[in-house]
Amino acid sequence: AGYLLPVQYGTGVIAEHMAVRTKCGLFDVSHMGEIILKGPDALKNLNHLLTNDYTVMACGQARYSPMCNEEGGVVDDLIVYKVRDDCYFIVVNAANKDKDYAWMKAHVSGEAQLSDISASVAQLALQGPKAMDILRKVAREEDIPEKYYTCKFHCTIDGMDCIISKTGYTGEDGFELYCAPADAPALWDALTAAGALPCGLGARDTLRLEAAMPLYGHELSPSINPYEAGLGIFVKLEKPD
């Protein structure tokens, strides 16, 4: 997709994989895409664009969903965070962010606006059974979400503004932190100094595969529908109009 990212660090894929399974690893996944959907008709459009149902959702809650084309094939899979009743923060796969944004723009209707904010957001993924302990060394307790698939939007770490979500792509406990790109190196340094091991995309792939988490371009594609991919639980056929 045109990104220069480490497959592994000096420790190697196996050591990085095991660090996430037993302690804590840190991934730079700033290549992921971020989109804002807002307006009075934001919810209506979410339920139109995505297969999951976003009707009943609290602010600060996150929800996963496939996004499908007219034939039922998967355009992408993504996570939606509810900022407020008329605003949603959407995280999409890096290789698909331009395609996803164009797809959404082509299918949004009514009073709703889309904004691609990918260039102004960096993402670090802190993953593993010790992730909570490490995050507590650098973040305020009130800024740390406790429940899986929830987030805190207005957090600070060493004076840096960030979003902290209790989500991940490894099958382990963990967090994903969103910040300004200029703050990402300092945030990375703070988390590694607190004990997180730098991990590359090689370990990220083995971890997600071991946890049976699909990856677009492999287990997901426009020729594969959510049922074929084992994601039928995220398809809600009856949603409010």
Go through the PLM ranges and name each one:
Residues 1-11, 83-241:
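Conserved, structured C-terminal
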Residues 1-68, 73-75, 202:
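Acidic, proline/glycine-enriched N-terminal capping motif
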Residues 32-34, 64, 77, 121, ...:
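Short, acidic/polar N-cap/turn motifs at the starts of alpha helices
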